[in-house]
């Protein structure tokens, strides 16, 4: 695998940080902080956090109106923990993000923020998030910390640049939001909470591998061993289909949610599986990957919103 020129990378990063530290011409804005926090990721994960919270209240028989502050602390805490993890990820990846089209304009790359500023911003966000989760239950705070540790240390600092298993490791951290939401109400974690965790866990590989296929040359240039880079598209497609099958099975294990949920979950799963299998015949792999990526976003939103709606 071709590795990026680390000497040039280091020089670019040092120069950018020096410029950011020595001048006040470039004024920081809230938009820059939101970019570092990856608000798209945070927002989508807050949907699953709320679903966990709502379902926990439903199944232990309490009214959400009696847990107003718990809802606030949970959503704010989860958002800050996720934002902190994403900001720290920006700090860690600032030496390679300039090699990728979708990340080259991040404040961590352009020099608008110094590396030290990004690092401290991530630490403060993460600590504040854990604190707010602690105001709900210790279990929620511990789960939040575990998710943060897995994402920042095990994924960003270790496996992302060393193994194709990076996607699996990242999927663990990405699957904890429903657990955070549920444990903020009920620390015992019902089996439904764990099924929601596994839905998130199996959803992420086909989602992120589709993105990796779309951006395969960028990942190759950055030296990141994503599966499409190391094993090629055919192997990646097979892996994606396997995960979609597992996801569909797990989602249907929540059949006690009712016939409407079960029917829609089955349709969503079979539809995604059909699209996945079609990829073996499509000539345009990038177009197929784009379709898989968009489908994954719709799948997640519809499924978790539906979990809430059928319990209203």
From Swiss-Prot:
It comes from the Bacteria. Pathway: Porphyrin-containing compound metabolism; heme O biosynthesis; heme O from protoheme: step 1/1. Coiled coil: none annotated. It is a multi-pass membrane protein. It catalyses: heme b + (2E,6E)-farnesyl diphosphate + H2O = Fe(II)-heme o + diphosphate. Its main location: membrane. Keywords: Cell membrane, Heme biosynthesis, Membrane, Transferase, Transmembrane, Transmembrane helix. It is found in: Cell membrane. The chain crosses the membrane at residues 40-60, 68-88, 113-135, 139-158, 165-185, 193-213, 240-260, 262-282, 291-311. Gene3D superfamilies: UbiA prenyltransferase (1.10.357.140). One of its GO terms (biological process) is heme O biosynthetic process. Converts heme B (protoheme IX) to heme O by substitution of the vinyl group on carbon 2 of heme B porphyrin ring with a hydroxyethyl farnesyl side group. Carbon 2 of the heme B porphyrin ring is defined according to the Fischer nomenclature. Interacts with CtaA. Belongs to the UbiA prenyltransferase family. Protoheme IX farnesyltransferase subfamily. This is Protoheme IX farnesyltransferase. It comes from Halalkalibacterium halodurans (strain ATCC BAA-125 / DSM 18197 / FERM 7344 / JCM 9153 / C-125) (Bacillus halodurans).
């Amino acid at each position: 695998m071709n590795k990026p020129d680390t000497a040039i990378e280091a020089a670019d990063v040092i120069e950018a940080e020096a410029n950011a530290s020595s001048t006040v011409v470039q004024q920081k804005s809230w938009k820059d902080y939101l970019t570092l926090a990856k608000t798209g990721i945070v927002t989508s994960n807050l949907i699953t956090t709320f679903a966990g919270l709502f379902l926990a209240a439903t199944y232990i028989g309490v009214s959400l109106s009696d847990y107003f502050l718990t809802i606030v602390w949970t959503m704010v805490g989860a958002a800050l923990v996720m934002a902190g993890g994403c900001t720290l990820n920006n700090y860690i990846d600032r030496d390679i993000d300039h090699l990728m089209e979708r990340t080259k304009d991040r404040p961590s790359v352009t020099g608008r923020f110094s590396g030290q500023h990004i690092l401290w911003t991530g630490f403060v966000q993460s600590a504040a998030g854990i604190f707010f989760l602690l105001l709900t239950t210790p279990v929620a705070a511990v789960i939040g910390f575990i998710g943060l540790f897995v994402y920042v240390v095990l994924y960003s600092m270790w496996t992302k640049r060393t193994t194709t298993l990076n996607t699996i490791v990242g999927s663990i951290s990405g699957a904890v939001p429903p657990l955070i939401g549920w444990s903020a109400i009920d620390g015992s974690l019902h089996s439904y909470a764990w099924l929601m965790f596994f839905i998130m866990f199996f959803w992420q590989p086909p989602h992120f591998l589709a993105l990796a296929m779309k951006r395969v040359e960028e990942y190759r240039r950055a030296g990141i061993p994503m599966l499409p880079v190391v094993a090629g598209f055919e192997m990646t497609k097979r892996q994606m289909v396997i995960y979609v099958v597992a996801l569909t099975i797990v989602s249907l294990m929540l059949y006690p949610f009712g016939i409407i949920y079960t029917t829609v979950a089955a349709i969503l799963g079979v539809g995604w599986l059909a699209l996945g299998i079609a990829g073996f015949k499509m000539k345009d792999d990038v177009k197929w990957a784009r379709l898989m990526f968009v489908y994954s976003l719709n799948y997640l939103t519809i499924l978790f919103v539906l979990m809430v709606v059928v319990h209203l």
